[in-house]
Curated annotation (Swiss-Prot):
Molecular function, one GO term: nucleotide binding
Transmembrane segments: none
Biological pathway: Pyrimidine metabolism; dUMP biosynthesis; dUMP from dCTP (dUTP route): step 1/2
Enzyme Commission number: 3.5.4.13
Protein name (Swiss-Prot/TrEMBL): dCTP deaminase
PANTHER family hit by this protein: DCTP DEAMINASE
Species of provenance: Haemophilus influenzae (strain PittEE)
Signal sequence annotation: none
Stored CDD domains: trimeric_dUTPase
Composition bias, Basic and acidic residues: 169-179
Keyword Nucleotide-binding carried by entry: yes
Entry-linked Pfam families: DCD (PF22769)
SUPFAM superfamilies (UniProt xref): dUTPase-like
Length: 195
């Protein structure tokens, strides 16, 4: 069952779901709560590797990933990060999210941004039960013009569903959880996948 705005407010008030900093109640609408853009970004370096062999030896995949990803880029308040057409970039939400073992979250981009060509979360929009940390956004500009993205702008909306019971292996307790407690635009850790 997806939570309505009344339940989202109650779950936040009772500490069942946590968003830090907590958005004002006027950012809770119908069945979602708005989240804002943080200031941490990472981009792919131009032409630094001919390809990434996703099923190759882990050491080679690690080296390839390291060679293509930039260091963290921190955008000062009031300044903009420019996402050019055909470009993929990683960023984070301003808010850190904490979910219990019986709630799953979903992140959706804003329709107004999609109409400009901005994909906010390319494929991975599920926030697992037991998640704790900022949400990394996978931005892609499929439009024709560069887009200026500024920290603190509303970038998407979270919704929540109560599971039929508590997850047996919530994200926070998994030893193989690659992005546990992430607070910055963490690059892919596909090289840490178990076989």
């Amino acid at each position: 069952m997806r939570l309505c705005d009344t339940d989202i407010e109650r779950y936040l008030d009772d500490g069942i779901i946590s968003l830090t900093p907590r958005p004002n109640n006027d950012k809770i609408n119908g069945a979602t709560i708005d989240v804002r853009l943080g200031n941490s970004f990472r981009v792919f370096r131009e032409h630094s590797a001919p390809f990434i062999d996703l099923s190759g030896p882990k050491e080679e995949v690690s080296a390839q990933l390291e060679s293509v990803m930039s260091d963290e880029i921190l955008i000062p308040e009031g300044e903009a990060f420019f996402l050019h057409p055909g470009t993929l970039a990683l960023a984070t939400t301003l808010e850190s999210v904490k979910l219990p073992a019986n709630i799953i979250g979903w992140l959706d981009g804003r329709s107004s941004l999609a109409r400009l060509g901005l994909m906010v979360h390319v494929t991975a929009h599920r926030i697992d039960p037991g998640w704790e940390g900022k949400i990394v956004l996978e931005f892609y500009n499929s439009g024709k013009l560069p887009l200026a993205l500024r920290p603190n702008m509303v970038i998407g909306a979270l919704s929540f569903e109560v599971l039929s019971g508590e997850a047996k292996r919530p994200y926070s307790s998994r030893k193989d959880a690659k992005y546990k407690n992430q607070q910055s635009a963490v690059a892919s850790r596909i090289d840490e996948d178990k076989e």
